[in-house]
């Protein structure tokens, strides 16, 4: 399984050393940009921890536990946001539902009727089914509110024996202090252009090394972003966006309508719509960074800052039409 974790060799060795010395922490916070492999790493770690042989965190691939993950043929996990269902009875996974702004407390401690008798905190405290520990993965840790964080505190402070909790977010700055201070922080760097290009070619996403390198550089180390760039209509989208961004007259209403149409064309899939808008704003960021080399660098810097703010709102689950309208109006000022 570890051979499929590319670009994070140092972190793999760090965990192996800690495990070999019996000093593995009970709570971790994985941080890094979306698409650099944090979640894939977390599942590989879970497979190694739950393996019955536990050989230097290398899953054997043949024990009862490893077979639940796919055995020796396990390469990566088929998950997509909150729709993912854990393949293992001692592995628990939760993430923010697409229609929620925060991680619901019910996922952590159960609803009001079952409070304290359901949810991740309760499940991880129970006796392991396969007698080899438990692992809990909390995706979207950026979206804890105070209520959810308080529900998790006791479990973070006193993890059950043989249990490991892994929280996944994008940066420590987005974590509540009560969460951040109780976890060992593991920072994931963006994938290098060489590593990301090789992955794109290996997966058949890029048809050549040159094409893979081009997308890898534009994606800034994110596999998710590179996949979006590989979409057949990205070049036309970039051309269309550049035409509007360089126009002498900025029509905020028309721009907002255009962007809303591009997002709504993807249907009701909220994560997909959010990724599309993130891609559009990412292309705008690239444009403004290049524009800053021109004479009017101050205006480009202002527009870049407003676009980065819009990206932040997309990641914070703000209503997309509102984000689009606010961005188009903001860019229209001083055009």
Model-inferred region functions:
Residues 2-147:
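Clamp-loader machinery-focused feature within the broader ASCE/P-loop NTPase space
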Residues 85-87, 159, 179:
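Short, structurally constrained coil/turn elements
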Residues 112, 116, 133, 144-148, ...:
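Short, well-structured alpha-helical patches and their helix-loop capping segments
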Residues 150-164:
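Conserved catalytic/switch belt of AAA+ P-loop NTPases
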